[in-house]
């Protein structure tokens, strides 16, 4: 009799635990929000992984809107439905603060990027930087459009400091975002490509190529800022996401993609 009662009690305890877990799961789903996050192209692969981690932990779903920082800024200024903006630089988030399009006190630097020169053209592998840029073997050099793409602006800065930007103007192919520049290089439509370090690390076949380091004194620091927009202020999940981005686990993920975290 005692044994049967013990079995019944154990069964009841198990049922109660299962019901409790189901209740928590249901509540998480009921409270889950869709958060619209505008993400600079260089950060697309990291955010897709972070998105899954965030959903597992909180139940909230990130809807990613991807593009150059400049194009995302234009969307925001025109009333685009973006709750959080992860830019590839600092100027545009600061402008959103000035224009009162953001929640004050939410701007922060989530990563610092590095500019690299990269190629799949084996004929260039033995050349050194910056001499490689003036080689007769180089016909096409890809950079992001400096007007819209922060890594493109950094590329232009580097070329100007070396003193060859105008000389190379006929060879420059402008990409609408940094991912497009990388893909043009990967498809061998470019001899050289100025890309983010994260582009190279993210791509599983990057070992085929040659990477040239670009001295960081040739371009302004690429501090990538995030900020919450006014629509995000109404969503508890948006605040949770900003906190999640600065957690130790997420910082490690970001470092693994080639970014500097200070």
Spans of features found by a protein language model:
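Short regulatory "switch" loops immediately downstream of catalytic or recognition motifs
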Residues: 1-2, 20-21, 202
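Short active-site loop at a secondary-structure junction
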Residues: 105
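Exported/periplasmic ABC-transporter solute-binding proteins
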Residues: 33-57, 63-65, 70, 74-80, ...
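Bacterial N-terminal signal peptides that target proteins for export
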Residues: 2-16
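Bacterial N-terminal signal peptides
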Residues: 15-25
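Sec/Tat signal peptide C-region and signal peptidase I cleavage site
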Residues: 28-32
């Amino acid at each position: 009799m005692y044994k049967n009662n013990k079995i019944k009690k154990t069964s009841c305890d198990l049922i109660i635990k299962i019901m409790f877990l189901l209740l928590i799961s249901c509540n998480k789903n009921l409270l889950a929000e869709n958060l619209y996050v505008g993400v600079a192209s260089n950060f697309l692969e990291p955010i897709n992984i972070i998105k899954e981690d965030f959903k597992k932990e909180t139940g909230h779903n990130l809807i990613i809107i991807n593009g150059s920082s400049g194009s995302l800024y234009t969307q925001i200024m025109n009333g685009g439905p973006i709750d959080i903006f992860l830019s590839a630089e600092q100027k545009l988030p600061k402008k959103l603060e000035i224009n009162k399009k953001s929640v004050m006190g939410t701007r922060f630097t989530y990563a610092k990027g590095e500019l690299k020169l990269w190629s799949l053209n084996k004929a260039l592998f033995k050349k050194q930087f910056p001499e490689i840029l003036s080689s007769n073997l180089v016909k096409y050099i890809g950079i992001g459009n400096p007007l819209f793409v922060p890594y493109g602006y950094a590329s232009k800065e580097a070329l100007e400091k070396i003193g060859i930007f105008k000389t190379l103007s006929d060879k420059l192919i402008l990409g609408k975002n940094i991912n497009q520049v990388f893909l043009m290089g990967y498809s061998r439509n470019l001899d050289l490509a100025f890309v983010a370090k994260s582009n190279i690390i993210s791509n599983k076949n990057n070992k085929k190529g040659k990477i040239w380091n670009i001295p960081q004194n040739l371009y302004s620091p690429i501090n990538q800022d995030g900020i919450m927009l006014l629509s995000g202020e109404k969503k508890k999940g948006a605040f949770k996401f900003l906190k999640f981005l600065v957690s130790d686990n997420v910082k490690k993920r970001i470092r693994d993609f080639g970014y500097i975290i200070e």
